[in-house]
């Protein structure tokens, strides 16, 4: 799962990124509403953590706009605005939860988990490709009824490939899914994790699309 963090306070942003990674989530971070909207258009996210005091636009206006565009992913507002009126306004415009700064990281983690569970229960919580089943709420993967033990990076790669099963995924998209896990990623980071993932799901199942990226197929015979 991948989280989009929209926060213009650099110090807090770094802390939020670290907190997300510690919990096993990949994340992208932006500092303006415009950049956030561009990220939503270009990527696939499971949740947005949104500050309201953005430099280019009020976060409530941004939230209202993305809801009008039919983005249904859960949004957690993270803000210093602490009045009842502020909270009601945020929830009414489309937020799924509202957390006031300062906050405890444990509470933030719990609220994110609750939002993801709720969202997954409302829609498709499982991805199924051949005999592979990925439960997005539990972050578990089974192959032929047997649970696979994956690292967080392997899980991030497999979930992306399963979402686009049968279609090639560009290596840059896959690289971005795991980039945040490494402070100084090497040039072969992606290849190493693809190799390890192939050992677990079947070598011929993840195919190299020369000059582009990788593609997951339903079984090794396809």
UniProtKB/Swiss-Prot annotation:
GO annotation (BP), single: phosphorelay signal transduction system
Record's PROSITE patterns? OMPR_PHOB, RESPONSE_REGULATORY
Q: Name one GO molecular function term.
A: phosphorelay response regulator activity
User: InterPro entries this protein is in?
Assistant: CheY-like_superfamily, OmpR/PhoB-type_DNA-bd, Sig_transdc_resp-reg_C-effctor, Sig_transdc_resp-reg_receiver, WalR-like, WH-like_DNA-bd_sf
Record annotation: effect of changing residue 214 to F: In strain: ECOR 27
Q: Which Gene3D superfamilies match?
A: 3.40.50.2300, 6.10.250.690, Winged helix-like DNA-binding domain superfamily/Winged helix DNA-binding domain
Pfam families referenced in this protein's UniProt entry, alphabetically: Response_reg (PF00072), Trans_reg_C (PF00486)
Its localization reads: Cytoplasm
The yes or no answer to whether the keyword Phosphoprotein is present is yes
- Reproduce the miscellaneous comment text: The activity of the BasR protein is in some natural isolates, but not in strain K12, controlled at a post-transcriptional level by the PmrD protein under low Mg(2+) concentration conditions.
UniProt cross-references to PANTHER family, sorted A to Z: REGULATOR OF RPOS, TRANSCRIPTIONAL REGULATORY PROTEIN BASR
Subunit and partners: Homodimer.
- Write the protein's name: Transcriptional regulatory protein BasR
């Amino acid at each position: 799962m991948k989280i989009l963090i929209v926060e213009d306070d650099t110090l807090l942003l770094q802390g939020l990124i670290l907190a997300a990674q510690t919990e096993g989530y990949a994340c992208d971070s932006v500092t303006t509403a415009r950049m956030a909207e561009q990220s939503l258009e270009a990527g696939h996210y499971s949740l947005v953590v949104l500050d309201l005091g953005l430099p280019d636009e009020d976060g409530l206006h941004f939230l209202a706009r993305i809801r009008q565009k039919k983005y249904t992913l859960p949004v957690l507002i993270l803000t210093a605005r602490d009045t009842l009126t502020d909270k009601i306004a945020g929830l009414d415009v489309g937020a799924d939860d509202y957390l006031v700064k300062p906050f405890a990281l444990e509470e933030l983690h719990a609220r994110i988990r609750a939002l993801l569970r709720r969202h997954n229960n409302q829609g498709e919580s499982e991805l199924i490709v051949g005999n592979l089943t990925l439960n997005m709420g539990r972050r578990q993967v089974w192959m032929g009824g047997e649970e696979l033990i994956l690292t967080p990076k392997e899980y991030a790669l497999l979930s992306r490939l399963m979402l686009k099963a049968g279609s090639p995924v560009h290596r840059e998209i896959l690289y971005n899914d795991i980039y945040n896990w490494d402070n100084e990623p090497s040039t072969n980071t992606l290849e190493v994790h693809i190799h390890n993932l192939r050992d677990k799901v079947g070598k011929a199942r993840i195919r190299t699309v020369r000059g582009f990226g990788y593609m997951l197929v339903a079984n090794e015979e396809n």
